[in-house]
Design a protein with these regions (language model features):
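The feature marks the mature, well-folded catalytic cores of soluble enzymes
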Residues: 1-367
Length: 367
């Protein structure tokens, strides 16, 4: 079964930005954002950092005040930083299935590490190095020989005959997957015969009993073909938080309104409507808003979204965009969805300059 993100976790993975990536024009700001994420994670659970320059990254982490007793660094060549989409997707064997901490069974079934192919969101960008990270980590026995990560009992499963990105699927931990039609049915990813093929695939690999297809919703500047983690997210107690646009003149208004109506029509496995909580859509942010704007990027609108939050043990990390009212409203919605967790905001304006945000650069590994 594919666990819900709020179930107990072993650690989180970050793939660190470096000078040979598209982050180069504003690398210091990107690395500072990653340091803020790393500090927040290591207050609650261990952290795996993947980088081609381990000595430099270790120095950054130490100087940044990160608890190094919680950190494992893996040396590996990388194209970019989007761990959500190139990292392992983990399932749990049946005797550890559960939708909450209370359902977790200590000492139950093992974790299965699914290694899918990542092809740069439908061959838009180079991904040859990122696509080898999982195999390198596993072959180096990084998981097997490390007490910090504590995932020695995980089983590797080669799924590289299929293309799948972690940001394209949401699980409620009870057998339901929420996913965007546009992304999964993209011709540049998999050659499948429609939704029924995916339903069989998700049942075989993830134990999914149901797939809810989201047909509407998008963000300008998004390279992923509308990843679900930018639009709508499962939360505990049959809740979905989603992005809502309140400005009829905004280009997103109609599509997000249609998405909202579709979400209202979805039902839980028990046949009841989901509890829906609306996140605000951030005010428009453009590349030209930054003093060091890259001329080649033009004046494009960037895909800022509060739906791109990360749930970790005891906390929710969510992106902020220097918009005090919207940032605060988003925090209040997330507190409503996760009342027992600390809600921690992290300025992610630099991340959207490369068309992702906080959830996109992280991947959690469940217990």
């Amino acid at each position: 079964m594919l666990p819900a993100e709020w179930e107990p976790q072993r650690f989180v993975q970050l793939t660190w930005p470096h000078a040979d990536t598209d982050w180069a024009p504003y690398l210091d700001a990107a690395q500072e954002c990653f340091l803020n994420i790393a500090r927040a994670i290591t207050l609650h659970e261990p952290l795996l950092v993947v980088t081609p320059t381990p000595e430099d990254v270790e120095a950054q982490l130490r100087e940044g005040g990160v608890d190094m007793s919680q950190v494992v660094i893996e040396e590996c060549p990388t194209n970019d930083t989007w761990a959500r989409d190139h990292a392992f997707i983990c399932t749990r064997e049946p005797d550890k299935i559960g939708g909450s901490t209370d359902d977790y069974v200590e000492g139950g079934g093992n974790i299965i590490l699914h290694d899918f192919t990542f092809n740069g969101w439908g061959m838009k960008f180079a991904a040859n190095l990122d696509n080898q990270i999982n195999r390198t980590i596993y072959d180096d026995d990084t998981f097997a020989d490390n007490d910090i990560l504590d995932i020695w009992d995980a089983t590797y499963q080669d799924n590289r005959d299929k293309i799948l990105e972690g940001g394209s699927i949401e699980s409620d931990g009870k057998g339901t997957i929420l996913t965007p039609t546009e992304c999964l049915l993209s011709a540049n990813r998999n050659i499948f015969e429609g939704k029924s093929s995916f339903k069989r695939w998700f049942f075989d690999d993830f134990g999914a009993q149901r797939v809810l297809w989201l047909d509407d919703g998008f963000l300008l500047g998004d390279d992923t073909d509308s990843h679900i983690d930018t639009l709508a997210r499962f939360c505990p107690n049959d809740t979905i938080v989603y992005v809502k646009c309140e400005d009829p003149d905004d280009i997103h208004y109609d599509a997000l309104k249609q998405m909202e109506e579709q979400l209202k029509g979805f039902s839980t496995v028990d046949g009841k409507p989901f509890r829906l909580l609306a996140l605000p859509l951030p005010a428009p942010i453009h590349e030209s808003d930054f003093p060091d704007a890259v001329a080649s990027e033009g004046d494009q609108r960037l895909p800022a979204t509060y739906a791109n939050f990360l749930v970790i043990n005891g906390a929710v990390l969510y992106p902020t965009y220097n918009q005090p009212d919207n940032d605060q409203r988003a925090a209040e919605v997330l507190h409503d969805a996760f009342p027992d967790r600390e809600i921690i905001g992290i300025d992610c304006r630099v991340l959207i300059r490369q068309h992702g945000s906080l959830h996109c650069v992280t991947m959690q590994y469940p217990k």
